Amino acid sequence: MNSLFASTARGLEELLKIELEKLGAVGCQVVQGGVHFQGDTRLIYQSLMWSRLASRIILPMGECKVYSDLDLYFGVQAINWTEIFNPGATFAVHFSGLNDTIRNSQYGAMKVKDAIVDAFTRKNLPRPNVDRESPDLRINVWLNKETASIALDLSGDGLHLRGYRDRTGLAPIKETLAAAIVMRSGWQPGTPLLDPMCGSGTLLIEAAMWATDRAPGLHRGHWGFSGWAQHDEAIWQEVKAEAQTRARKGLAEYSSHFYGSDSDARVIERARSNARRAGIGELITFEVKDVAQLSNPLPKGPYGTVISNPPYGERLDSDPALIALHSLLGRTMKNQFGGWNLSLFSASPDLLGSLQLRADKQFKAKNGPLDCVQKNYHIAETTADSKPATVAEDYANRLRKNLKKLEKWARQEGIECYRLYDADLPEYNVAVDRYGDWAVIQEYAPPKTVDAQKARQRLFDIIAATLSVLGIPPNKLVLKTRERQKGKNQYQKMSEKGEFLEVSEYNARLWVNLTDYLDTGLFLDHRIARRMLGEMSKGKDFLNLFSYTGSASVHAGLGGARNTTTVDMSRTYLEWAERNLRLNGLSGRAHRLIQADCLGWLREANEQFDLIFIDPPTFSNSKRMEESFDVQRDHVALMKDLKRLLRKGGTIMFSNNKRGFRMDLEGLAELGLTAQEITQKTLSPDFARNRQIHNCWLIRAA
């Protein structure tokens, strides 16, 4: 009997143990990453040929203590390699692990190689050659602290390489993991199996090979035992012949069918080629179509299983499309696949929540470095009076109601950008803004006391409901997370897409960027204030301080201002403002753009203006500013500087976003200024619920 080890992906060890025992293995012991077992020579070949789950079959050769590189050298040389190698066999060494002595795996591999070669030369035997690409023997050495374990890898290449897959195409899951997913799915061979996002067809091919009793090793052309002196070719040929006989019989007797589809025609062609090479091409129908076109291929029965490894995203901006995909799949399953089972393998359990289905079973496994989950669902049979479930129904109803009211109003006003929803319902704490045929969802970051997974699931529900109510494609929905603003956070860059969208606001055309920054370049709540500035600007000299992207300057220019001066500290936003002005035919000396610290520029300027708009930050202590600024504390001093630039009979429009802001009327009076609050006049219907979104004042000389 040989002591052997079968390695596998994390999470599949128990499944592998059952498989090995069915093959005849004894003494099976599960450890992390594999199973120790015992078996004769025939079992070695049986496990190599028939294991669908093992990554490699390893034959341990010995262990040694390693306190120096000489310990490793002599420990390896103590093994009788001349009884392991066939004459003329090539080899390669794979070394993993480090300790205080062996600090480089390449150095460790070199010492092992030297020890093996010297074992031959000392006996005056021809030295074996190294072949790193396709060796006859693979020697594996694992160094754990001071212990080196030396073994012969009888697999050669990993057992997931069945021989049917085109190696030029990347596979998101290995064949061994795919086989485990099929086994855990609850699917019964002989019943239909469908993968609506099949990619190169790995899940379906593994299922078909299992169902037709086709050994996973039948199509492999190279093994790790070809140069092994104890290899028994006669037994191997018996095992191989048996596998071929069973495969022919299994294919001839199998009567059910497999169905695969994908939106990418290239991967579907690759899937067809893979299935043909695997010998089961006639059993699988592959089609080019996306999930939106998914339909039950057997509406009158029998019931089957839908299985898939759907895509997942690592970035938040990919979520809308993926959430829509999962939501659509869930609805399609309920509408067309009543009585069927569904099994999905995913690295994103939260996305599976978008199915709006309750899982009966779930399993955990590793896909490379990724923690993954497989969830199995049974789809209830539908009845004539069954009503489809609505995702986030309260939120969807409110959004639908707001849309009906605001869409008509916006069209009459001549605006394309407006707020549709602003945390109307406390449990759905987001803002939804419309920008033409785009939508932006801003999630207000939940407090730390809220369960993060529940909050993420609710956000996914919001995205699915928003896409459904607005009827927009997922690629026109942008998702952002907004935290309480401090200093100039709103100006920090989030992305590098550089994609601008032209929108209309009354008679102005403006550029917005929905992805690269937390804000889009257009403060929607100031829309009416900008229109008022346009109406007040005719024939006047206009100053715009803390100008952001210059949209107020655009309205002033279109309103007939004699000239506009736009001041901001950010070169990025000044360039954006220049683009906005040019878009409206406003350019030349009459429309100046100045990059400067606004407070410093204000103290040094000696020009006069008829109309000044200033919308300062609530608080700022930027390194590029000479001093900190607090709008509550410093607004009177600010007005003192502004008054110096204000022409007789002129007006200052002063706005800020500080909640609970209190205007110091007495302080203004001492400066000879009066203030008229116009906040309510500047609030439009889409911000009617949030009357503290900003406050706005007209300030004039007394």
Swiss-Prot record:
It is an enzyme of class 2 (transferase). It is found in: Cytoplasm. Its EC number is 2.1.1.173, 2.1.1.264. It catalyses: guanosine(2445) in 23S rRNA + S-adenosyl-L-methionine = N(2)-methylguanosine(2445) in 23S rRNA + S-adenosyl-L-homocysteine + H(+); guanosine(2069) in 23S rRNA + S-adenosyl-L-methionine = N(2)-methylguanosine(2069) in 23S rRNA + S-adenosyl-L-homocysteine + H(+). Residues 43-154 form the THUMP domain. HAMAP family: 23SrRNA_methyltr_KL. One of its GO terms (molecular function) is RNA binding. It comes from Salmonella typhi. SUPFAM superfamilies: S-adenosyl-L-methionine-dependent methyltransferases. GO terms for cellular component: cytoplasm. Pfam families: Methyltrans_SAM, RlmL_1st, THUMP, UPF0020. Specifically methylates the guanine in position 2445 (m2G2445) and the guanine in position 2069 (m7G2069) of 23S rRNA. Belongs to the methyltransferase superfamily. RlmKL family. This is Ribosomal RNA large subunit methyltransferase K/L. NCBIfam families: PRK11783.1 (NF008748). InterPro entries: 23SrRNA_methyltr_KL (IPR017244), DNA_methylase_N6_adenine_CS (IPR002052), RlmKL-like_Mtase (IPR000241), RlmKL-like_Mtase_CS (IPR053943), RlmL_1st (IPR054170), SAM-dep_methyl-trfase (IPR019614), SAM-dependent_MTases_sf (IPR029063), THUMP_dom (IPR004114). The gene is rlmL. It comes from the Bacteria. Keywords: Cytoplasm, Methyltransferase, RNA-binding, rRNA processing, S-adenosyl-L-methionine, Transferase. PROSITE patterns: THUMP, UPF0020.
